[in-house]
Curated annotation (Swiss-Prot):
The gene is rplK. It comes from Streptococcus agalactiae serotype III (strain NEM316). GO terms for molecular function: large ribosomal subunit rRNA binding; structural constituent of ribosome. Disulfide bonds: none annotated. Part of the ribosomal stalk of the 50S ribosomal subunit. Interacts with L10 and the large rRNA to form the base of the stalk. L10 forms an elongated spine to which L12 dimers bind in a sequential fashion forming a multimeric L10(L12)X complex. This is Large ribosomal subunit protein uL11. One of its GO terms (biological process) is translation.
Amino acid sequence: MAKKVEKLVKLQIPAGKATPAPPVGPALGQAGINIMGFTKEFNARTADQAGMIIPVVISVYEDKSFDFITKTPPAAVLLKKAAGVEKGSGEPNKTKVATVTRAQVQEIAETKMPDLNAANLESAMRMIEGTARSMGFTVTD
């Protein structure tokens, strides 16, 4: 019989830098997970993506064992990296802080495709463009 999932824990952790310190430690401690076991495994799996923030969904089972799924970095993080800025605009409709090209948007959409609820690349690109506009970025051809 399959193990029964007791709890789902969702976190966003910098790749290769999971530590038992907050926010990771307390979230996993409440779920009863072996914190060191998780941090070692997560850091090993994400070592090649250094510098990115990686969303992770941890399934905790009744016997306190766990497994986790890493997702692609958030679109906002990928857009900031592509545009070379630290953060988006505080007033996106008034102040534009950066410009991204359609080619960069397409590259980000291809990266995010497994995690997006999009039927094709074109609709995924529209989602990424919407995120860019809401951050105060201008999308150019």
